[in-house]
Amino acid sequence: MLKQKIKDTTAVIGILGLGHVGYPMSSLFAKNGFTTVGYDINPTRLKDIQSGKVVSELDGILPVNKKKRQEKLAEIEKNLNLTNEEENLKNADVFLIDVPTPLKENETPNLVFLENTCKTICTFLKKGTLVIVESTIYPGATQEIVKPLLEESGLCAGTDFYLSFSPERIDPGNKKWGLEKIPKIVGGINKQSVDLASSLFSKIVETVIPVSSLEVAESTKMLENLFRSVNIALINDLSKFFEKMGIDTWETIAAASSKPFGFLPHYPGPGVGGHCIPKDPFYLLYKANKSGTNLEFVEEAAAINKNMPLYVIYLVEKTLKLCNKTLRDSSFAVLGVTYKRDVLDIRRTPSKTVVTELCKISKNLMIFDPLTDETFGAKTSTLDETIKGKDCIVLMVDHSYFRENNLEEKINELSPNCCVVDTRNFIDSKKLKKSIHYKCLGKP
């Protein structure tokens, strides 16, 4: 019955969690004709979606043309019911779990949102329903956590209802690789679960890749993000060494990238942020420790990335010394709050650590980001007012806005002997006056 509903696009899709994954996913289902219920307990998030404040999160699934974009948004709105009332999920044939899976203060998995979501689904679970977990979890968590909670409904996974894990794969701000173009990995508790989830996703994405088990699907997500984590850590570590050796890390990466095989460029930066890369190593480490396995390499890489914001402060102090200035007596402008270029997301952003630590030392610090009002307690204003009269400019995020607003020209208008610390190799130092002391992370 569900198979036919999926084929006819008459299945009702319930998506729990409308964050950076759940909102685009719910919109994608609605775009493809499915009646979709988007559920989130946060009324502010719902208000932001309904007002269009976060519509940029749909860039990967909407046309660029303004008229066509508005037409597609109208289609989505027609099929998408946004709600914070559980009762509106009662008619769902498919439940997708897209809630956050953060860390506790001791850097172990915090699965409270996942657990509460499973309990909510339990209320409306019926025979023939398909439940798909997209939230990132450690290998084995669907079997250990999700399955028992859902079976409190009195129904049996794999017999009475279907259970699948399909890791979310989304790159916020990436307009080339929108959700529809990213291959979808699908694992399940049995073949029927895999087949149903695969047929569902084939309705909204170009490529579906079934795998043999829930654990393989869970591990795929871990491997993808750990690959990035350890390679970013490698280049972050090397960049410190190259700096001391008088070697330009960025030029070295560009040269190595000319090799047509066996090399994938990663770039140094002020630390990792967002919903996955800073967190996922600790999910895997938790599971590894439980199984008596030591993943020293993964642990070391996570530590290197976590400490990069403090290295930025070291570079700031070092650059100020060239101007005979100290951290305590200097004024600062920090440019960029979000965790990466041209996105709204501030979760686990390295900027928070840099701002917090500098505020402990200096009472004169301002922060500016064109995409968010978050300042972590610091003062903010326009870009011009933020950098005006400051001893040191710290560029944390390479937003397109800074290029479009001629950041180099604005810096040149500042007083001589100003310092600039560029953590993204973004500023064109050749355009800066010689009186400006410029330092780029990864360059001598």
Description of each model-found segment:
Residues 1-444:
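Structural/interface elements that position substrates and couple domains in central-metabolism enzymes
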